[in-house]
């Protein structure tokens, strides 16, 4: 019996590598131009980092993480996303003591136990950015402009930038109440998990 790749993962063959390197190099060029520095993150972390960071009741934590016990009995998880690991590294290495705004980007494989289908794999590659140390919304605008630059360099033709906001710390409680009132009219339409 031949051993094949596990369902939901994909080999990146030599004829595809140049395209991957080109995208990664363009990401590096664009992000460093905006002052973002690359950070390389571990492939696996303590499970509690993701359950705390992403939220214990999210689909990612409840259904999609690859979690196992290591030989020492510690629960570890293959990273499902990069944000929690960046925050952990930021705190662990006291990066908050360096300068006010810290800007990082990462790229690499992520892992989620999802039903494989077109464009959705259990091991997938993600490029992400994180900016910490400021509540100024101008950093969000900078990230959006930077990503538009990146997408244009990649010559992506069909993409749409959609912007959403939960509001600032002062306005967020009123926003939540308005949202709750709006949703309460439709609670009977929601499943048990969402209700």
Residue locations for each model-derived region?
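TRNA-recognition modules of translation machinery and tRNA-sensing kinases, especially anticodon-binding
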Residues: 1-195
């Amino acid at each position: 019996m031949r051993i094949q790749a596990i369902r939901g993962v994909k080999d990146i063959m030599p004829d595809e590598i140049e395209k991957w390197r080109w995208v990664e190099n363009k990401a590096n060029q664009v992000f460093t131009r905006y002052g973002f520095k690359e950070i390389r993150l571990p492939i696996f972390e303590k499970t509690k980092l993701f359950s705390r960071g992403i939220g214990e009741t999210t689909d990612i934590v409840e259904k999609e993480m690859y979690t196992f016990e290591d030989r020492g009995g510690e629960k570890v998880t293959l990273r499902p996303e990069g944000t929690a690991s960046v925050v952990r590294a930021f705190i662990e290495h006291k990066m908050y003591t360096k300068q006010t705004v810290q800007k990082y980007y990462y790229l690499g494989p992520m892992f989620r136990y999802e039903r494989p289908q077109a464009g959705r794999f259990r091991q997938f590659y993600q490029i992400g950015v994180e900016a910490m140390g400021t509540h100024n919304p101008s950093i969000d605008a900078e990230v959006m402009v930077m990503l538009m630059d990146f997408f244009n360099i990649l010559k992506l033709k069909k993409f749409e930038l959609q912007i959403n906001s939960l509001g600032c710390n002062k306005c967020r409680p009123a926003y939540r109440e308005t949202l709750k009132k709006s949703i309460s009219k439709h609670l009977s339409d929601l499943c048990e998990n969402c209700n």
